[in-house]
């Protein structure tokens, strides 16, 4: 597996925070022994302002009979103090957030002092509404500064936030409110992206009509578009009238390092989304530490992570890590193509952005439009590029490096998960030549292993399942209200390891290449969707008897969604029924669950025990009709020819 590599530009190397030799030495030291790992993280914890410094660094056991993950357990802190107060003391007027609105005429610069005041006002108002330490608060927000204000106000008063992506449907929102038993919802009248409006408040109203949402006592509504929305007298309150007149001082809640910080729901291989729980001290230590390492951060950086706050990247690397470090973070409400595909470049120039962290999906979409739009901007302020969410294909990497970055900016291809809290694998800039598509090296304290399906650790160049043979401070602690599922999902299949659910190749240089999910989870545009969740949505449609969902190659999104559907005998396969099914799924889960291909079939390939053989469907969805592997366990191998005919016919129509 020999791969082309790109050396780091000499001018970048000259100013890099760390050299290849320093990385090798520090990494070796950070994993030398459990004591050495603790010593490393004790040193990194010095980046945090603690109310009470921890003396116990880690207490971890992956033994299912005596399972525990604790970091800095006797430490006390408040994250909002780390993100705000300490910078207000040292540099109050430095921009904390640069907000770029959906329309290019809209932007706002918010200093650390102003952000601190806004957070304190909302924190005080939330306390008056009866929100206490440990209470859950659901945020369903557009990409506006109030979203970050609300996250930080929760951390100020010790409430646990659960941010739900504004593109999710009312039903998805309702299910998350029910699972978290939230006391408060914070939303906006509407969201606006690409000049299209999303009815956020209307979706909240529909979600709160669902049984089991009685825990919600109030809804705070931010005025964004000004369109009229129904406000229910006692329950609903306008954000701006609520915070006006509140004090600019809000006493921060003293939090134990292991107190819950936030819930973030992510798709699993079973239908029900799981509430990933992160705690306070370990999460912020890991977030800040990895941010500084991976992005080679300098004092005057203007840093733009394009992720929505509804995803984990928007939590860790758009909000908490940059603000904890005192770095200016850029927040963009819109989409890359509005008003034209030149928008990203114009934003880079307008705010003199130095570091850009975005998803391969966005890069592929821009690349498809050619170089002209990108070349409308200068982009000379950029010094570092990053990618996140899914493995980047080498063609997109090349274009990002050469065209967007002008062949001078290193590209950090980062691998991590909602569950890991922060980046786990990445080529720390200045330490290694880059290989397009490779996540390269583990970060400090992280011990990746490649293991086969029998759980045997493989040496040298190898391909298998990616597991982590240790704990780290940013690791999730449990699935909210379902610890048994947490243990089963991550620690049971390969005892003694954290199982990532991803496949990996390690090349002869020891560098890691992520190959994609090995479970029934799809990675669409860098966002995870469970096949079971989509299947149950399809089967909920009255015309459908059974469905199987698999991933398929997609030019822009990396992975598309393909559904094989058996209709009830009374139904007839038509194009209009396909459109109706797609609308149904999008309304139940959200537009992200768009079905790219729907094949109406009479049978599904099943084993004698009744299991659907998804690998066959994956091959067919990718247009591979021969060499389908071992079919001996199929109950009826003649179904393959029938399926191949359906897929071939449909694909011929669409081409």
UniProtKB/Swiss-Prot annotation:
GO terms for biological process, alphabetical: acetyl-CoA biosynthetic process from acetate
Cofactor or coenzyme needed: Mg(2+)
Binding-site residues for Mg(2+), renumbered to this chain: 539, 541
NCBIfam families, alphabetized: Ac_CoA_lig_AcsA, PRK00174.1
Record PROSITE patterns: AMP_BINDING
Keywords: Acetylation, ATP-binding, Ligase, Magnesium, Metal-binding, Nucleotide-binding
Entry protein name: Acetyl-coenzyme A synthetase
Enzyme Commission number, as recorded: 6.2.1.1
Residues that hold CoA according to the record: 193-196, 313, 525, 586
Molecular functions per Gene Ontology: acetate-CoA ligase activity; AMP binding; ATP binding; metal ion binding
PTM notes: Acetylated. Deacetylation by the SIR2-homolog deacetylase activates the enzyme.
HAMAP family reported in the protein's UniProt record: Ac_CoA_synth
Stored CDD domains: ACS
SUPFAM superfamilies recorded: Acetyl-CoA synthetase-like (SSF56801)
PANTHER family: ACETYL-COENZYME A SYNTHETASE, ACETYL-COENZYME A SYNTHETASE 1
Similarity field: Belongs to the ATP-dependent AMP-binding enzyme family.
Keyword Metal-binding belongs to the record: yes
Modified residues (N6-acetyllysine): 611
Keyword Nucleus carried by entry: no
A cellular-component GO term for this protein: cytosol
Functional description taken from the UniProt entry: Catalyzes the conversion of acetate into acetyl-CoA (AcCoA), an essential intermediate at the junction of anabolic and catabolic pathways. AcsA undergoes a two-step reaction. In the first half reaction, AcsA combines acetate with ATP to form acetyl-adenylate (AcAMP) intermediate. In the second half reaction, it can then transfer the acetyl group from AcAMP to the sulfhydryl group of CoA, forming the product AcCoA.
Pfam families, per database record: ACAS_N, AMP-binding, AMP-binding_C
Regions that span the bilayer: none
């Amino acid at each position: 597996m020999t791969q082309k590599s790109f050396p780091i530009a000499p001018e970048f190397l000259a100013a890099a925070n760390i050299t290849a030799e320093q990385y090798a030495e520090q990494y070796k030291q950070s994993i030398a022994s459990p004591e050495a790992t603790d010593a490393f993280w004790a040193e990194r914890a010095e980046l945090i302002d603690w109310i009470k410094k921890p003396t116990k660094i880690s207490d971890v056991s992956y033994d299912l009979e005596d399972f525990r993950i604790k970091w800095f357990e006797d430490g006390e802190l408040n994250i909002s103090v780390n993100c705000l107060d300490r910078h207000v003391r040292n540099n109050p007027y430095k921009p904390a957030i640069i907000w770029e609105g959906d329309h290019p005429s809209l932007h706002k610069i918010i200093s650390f002092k102003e952000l601190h005041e806004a957070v304190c006002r909302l924190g005080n108002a939330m306390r008056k509404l009866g929100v206490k330490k440990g209470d859950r608060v659901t945020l369903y927000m557009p990409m506006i500064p109030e979203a970050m204000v609300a996250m930080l106000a929760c951390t100020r008063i010790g409430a646990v936030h659960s941010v739900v992506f504004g593109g999710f449907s009312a039903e998805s929102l309702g299910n998350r409110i029910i699972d978290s038993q939230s006391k408060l919802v914070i939303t906006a009248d509407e969201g606006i992206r690409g000049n299209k409006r999303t009815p956020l408040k209307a979706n909240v109203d529909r979600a709160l009509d669902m049984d089991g949402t009685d825990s919600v006592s109030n809804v705070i509504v931010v005025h964004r578009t000004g369109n009229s929305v129904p406000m229910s007298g006692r329950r609903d309150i306008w954000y701006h009238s609520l915070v006006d007149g509140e004090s600019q001082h809000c006493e921060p809640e003293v939090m134990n390092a292991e107190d819950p910080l936030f819930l973030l729901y992510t798709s699993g291989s079973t239908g029900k989304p799981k509430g990933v729980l992160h705690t306070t001290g370990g999460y912020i230590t890991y977030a800040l530490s990895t941010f500084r390492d991976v992005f080679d951060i300098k004092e005057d950086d203007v840093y733009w992570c394009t992720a929505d706050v509804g995803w984990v990247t928007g939590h860790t690397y758009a909000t908490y890590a940059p603000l904890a470090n005192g770095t200016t973070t850029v927040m963009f409400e819109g989409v890359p193509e509005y008003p034209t595909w030149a928008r990203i470049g114009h934003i880079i120039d307008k705010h003199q952005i130095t570091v850009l962290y975005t998803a391969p999906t966005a890069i592929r979409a821009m690349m498809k439009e050619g170089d002209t739009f990108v070349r409308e901007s200068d982009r000379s302020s950029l010094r570092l590029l990053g990618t996140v969410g899914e493995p980047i294909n080498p063609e997109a990497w090349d274009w990002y490096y050469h065209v967007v970055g002008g062949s001078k900016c290193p590209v950090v291809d980062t691998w991590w998960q909602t569950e890991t809290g922060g980046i786990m694998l990445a080529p720390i800039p200045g330490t290694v030549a880059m290989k397009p598509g490779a996540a390269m090296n583990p970060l400090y304290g992280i011990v990746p292993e490649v293991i086969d399906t029998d759980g045997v650790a493989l040496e040298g160049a190898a391909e298998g399942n990616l597991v982590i043979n240790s704990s780290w401070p940013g690791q999730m602690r449990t699935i909210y209200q379902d610890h048994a599922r947490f243990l089963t999902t991550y620690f049971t299949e390969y005892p003694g390891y954290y199982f990532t659910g991803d496949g990996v190749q390690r090349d002869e240089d020891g560098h890691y290449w992520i190959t994609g999910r090995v479970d029934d989870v799809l990675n669409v545009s860098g966002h995870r969707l469970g096949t079971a969740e989509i299947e149950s949505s399809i089967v909920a449609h009255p015309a459908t008897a059974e469905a199987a969902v698999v991933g398929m190659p997609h030019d822009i999104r990396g992975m598309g969604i393909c559904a094989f559907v058996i209709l009830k005998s009374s139904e007839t396969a038509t194009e209009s029924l396909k459109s109706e099914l797609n609308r149904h799924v999008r309304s139940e889960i959200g537009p992200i669950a768009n079905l790219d291909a729907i094949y109406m079939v009479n049978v599904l390939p099943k084993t004698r025990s009744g299991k659907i053989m998804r690998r066959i469907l994956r091959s067919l969805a990718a247009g591979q009709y021969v060499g389908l592997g071992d079919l001996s366990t199929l109950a009826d191998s003649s179904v393959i020819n029938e399926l191949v005919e359906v897929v071939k016919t449909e694909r011929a129509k669409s081409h």
